Amino acid sequence: MNNQKSKFDQKWKLIRGQSMEWFSLLAEHDLKKVDKAEDKQDKFVTILQVKYGYTRQQAAEEINRHWVAFHRASKIAA
């Protein structure tokens, strides 16, 4: 899990850039909370739980689903 979290932290700027498009209920102040968090993945998942009523598992799956789609689209565009 720590390896996943460090990958999330490494990709946070890319994820952050897409987050408001992926999750329309997010606002800039939500993303700033994640920016300041020591464990960015945990904070982001928690915010999605609050905003969307997801379980932790659902929030993680939604992040992954959007990330995979974004990554595939980036490869196709390249």
Q: Where does each model-flagged region fall?
A:
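Intrinsically disordered, low-complexity, hydrophilic segments
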Residues: 1-78
